[in-house]
């Protein structure tokens, strides 16, 4: 691994040593986006000189192995994978029942009886020895983490395998924890970002119960000033002008997610694409109603129901996701997509519908001209 202790500024033609080590020719990272990013998307982005990523946080180890292998078959360049490091949800049957009762009208209209209980539909990397074994076997160039940090033994094993490690921070305290844990870079996620907020679990003692909601620009400046690791900006960045702005603030690269959803290589369905191209893209909401953790998506009826005044607190993450997915599946069977989780950032209306390689090339031209 290169020395990444001094983030510096990324200027035209001068990439940070970490990006050079990864073989990147552009300071652009495609966000992992579990359920939307595909091997085809990640490979196309990497082949274009940026860094593609797979979102494997909700995938079992065998599926992760297959996706990594499929990506490697499509590119000889570096790519990354992302995993979730949330604390397992403590069983709370009373909270689950209250949440299901609140969602009962949506189940009724779908012709469903609310389930008797909710399940933790996927686990955490913290307790996933099989996933660690897959990573050590396949050795992707980058492994990044959301919702917290892996265990020290996991970090050591991955580093010994020559893997570059990154984690998401939404506050200065989280960034300091990432630095103290010995990781190689920080992904600074502003409040504008689509999908799940990467906040550390409160029980880790790193973060406060209240989300400070820092925007990307402010967060990047804070982390560049008060940490020594390279900072990758994430949240609301949709074009080369946005990338240039983040580099000017001291970030070494920019991570874009929503910008890639309309690419034909993404797994986004027709309804998701239509909403992203429609008026609804101007109205994203940060809500815990879908999964149990705060996440930004295009407003829909499930979000409206979940965020009603006086509504109970959603079931714990990812147990609330169990209810949301059942509702979405039933509604989709009727061609009703108003309960689906269409994650998107605040810059969603700026999305362009282009093949991934063409989008990366356009971003590079815009960056050069900015």
Label for each model-derived stretch:
Residues 2-226, 363:
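Active-site entrance/lid segments in N-terminal catalytic domains of soluble metabolic enzymes
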């Amino acid at each position: 691994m290169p020395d990444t202790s001094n983030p510096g500024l990324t200027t035209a033609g001068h990439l940070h040593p970490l990006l050079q080590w990864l073989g990147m020719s552009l300071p652009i990272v495609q966000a992992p986006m579990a359920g939307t990013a595909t091997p085809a998307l990640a490979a196309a982005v990497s082949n274009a000189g940026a860094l593609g990523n797979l979102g494997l946080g909700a995938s079992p180890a065998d599926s992760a192995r297959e996706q990594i292998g499929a990506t490697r078959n499509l590119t000889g360049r570096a790519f990354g994978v992302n995993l979730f490091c949330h604390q397992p949800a403590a069983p709370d049957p009373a909270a689950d029942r209250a949440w299901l009762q609140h969602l009962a009208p949506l189940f009724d209209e779908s012709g469903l009886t609310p389930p008797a209980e909710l399940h933790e539909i996927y686990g955490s990397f913290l307790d996933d020895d099989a996933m660690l074994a897959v990573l050590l076997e396949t050795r992707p160039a980058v492994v990044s983490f959301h919702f917290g940090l892996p265990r020290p033994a996991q970090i050591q094993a991955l580093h010994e395998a020559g893997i570059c490690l990154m984690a998401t921070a939404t506050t200065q305290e989280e960034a300091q924890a990432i630095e103290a844990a010995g990781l190689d870079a920080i992904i600074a996620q502003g409040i504008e970002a689509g999908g799940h907020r990467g906040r550390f679990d409160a029980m880790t003692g790193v973060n406060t119960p209240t989300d400070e909601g820092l925007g990307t620009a402010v967060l990047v400046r804070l982390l560049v000033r008060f940490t020594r690791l390279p900072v990758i900006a994430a949240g609301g960045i949709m074009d080369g002008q946005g990338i240039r702005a983040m580099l000017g603030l001291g970030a070494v690269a920019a991570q874009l997610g929503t910008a890639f959803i309309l690419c034909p290589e993404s797994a986004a369905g027709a309804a998701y694409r239509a909403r992203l191209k429609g008026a609804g893209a101007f109205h994203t909401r940060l809500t815990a109603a879908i999964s149990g953790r705060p996440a930004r998506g295009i407003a829909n009826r499930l979000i409206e129901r979940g965020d009603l005044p006086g509504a109970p607190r959603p079931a714990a993450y990812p147990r609330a996701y169990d209810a949301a997915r059942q509702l979405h599946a039933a509604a989709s069977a009727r061609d009703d997509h108003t309960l689906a989780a269409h994650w998107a950032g605040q810059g969603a209306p700026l999305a362009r519908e282009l093949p991934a390689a063409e989008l990366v090339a356009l971003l590079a031209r815009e960056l050069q001209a900015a």
